[in-house]
């Protein structure tokens, strides 16, 4: 049975595996100033491979990748920020939107498109076309249904949308940030 689920409603839904979904965090700085924490729930019950890639990149537990760089979001930047659209990060190899690497090697295939881009806080994979997922991701700041079927949704911001909005304010139409926005720290939150 194929699930057609709304990502924004999944965060609060009580599904069978909801209690087993990993939660991860980013502690973000804008310029040199701490901006706050963003907490995200990963939908490993719908897209397990994609969710695991992101979770492991938050913890850094996989060590160094094929490109000789730590597989870890810590210290990486939000390199593309477009107000009323999304904030994009995850390029820890080149730091400009042209790099990145998954825990499975350079790129991996689109897992499925069951989850939809239904609103602010939706966490999705950035790519360069079909089956080119690496480490780059974006967080939507508005409803973006035109991305459905082209980008794999794998999570939802559960806390810290005010921080996402602060990041969004650093953006421009071209996507170039007004200030450097850095993932100062990141990891997994253990369930209690």
From Swiss-Prot:
<dbReference type="InterPro" id="IPR024936">
    <property type="entry name" value="Cyclophilin-type_PPIase"/>
</dbReference>
<dbReference type="GO" id="GO:0005737">
    <property type="term" value="C:cytoplasm"/>
</dbReference>
<dbReference type="GO" id="GO:0003755">
    <property type="term" value="F:peptidyl-prolyl cis-trans isomerase activity"/>
</dbReference>
<feature type="domain" description="PPIase cyclophilin-type">
    <location>
        <begin position="25"/>
        <end position="188"/>
    </location>
</feature>
<dbReference type="GO" id="GO:0071013">
    <property type="term" value="C:catalytic step 2 spliceosome"/>
</dbReference>
<keyword id="KW-0413">Isomerase</keyword>
<dbReference type="InterPro" id="IPR020892">
    <property type="entry name" value="Cyclophilin-type_PPIase_CS"/>
</dbReference>
<dbReference type="GO" id="GO:0005739">
    <property type="term" value="C:mitochondrion"/>
</dbReference>
<comment type="similarity">
    <text>Belongs to the cyclophilin-type PPIase family.</text>
</comment>
<dbReference type="InterPro" id="IPR002130">
    <property type="entry name" value="Cyclophilin-type_PPIase_dom"/>
</dbReference>
<dbReference type="GO" id="GO:0043231">
    <property type="term" value="C:intracellular membrane-bounded organelle"/>
</dbReference>
<dbReference type="GO" id="GO:0016018">
    <property type="term" value="F:cyclosporin A binding"/>
</dbReference>
<protein>
    <recommendedName>
        <fullName>Peptidyl-prolyl cis-trans isomerase 1</fullName>
        <ecNumber>5.2.1.8</ecNumber>
    </recommendedName>
</protein>
<dbReference type="GO" id="GO:0006457">
    <property type="term" value="P:protein folding"/>
</dbReference>
<dbReference type="InterPro" id="IPR029000">
    <property type="entry name" value="Cyclophilin-like_dom_sf"/>
</dbReference>
<comment type="function">
    <text>PPIases accelerate the folding of proteins. It catalyzes the cis-trans isomerization of proline imidic peptide bonds in oligopeptides.</text>
</comment>
<dbReference type="Pfam" id="PF00160">
    <property type="entry name" value="Pro_isomerase"/>
</dbReference>
<keyword id="KW-0697">Rotamase</keyword>
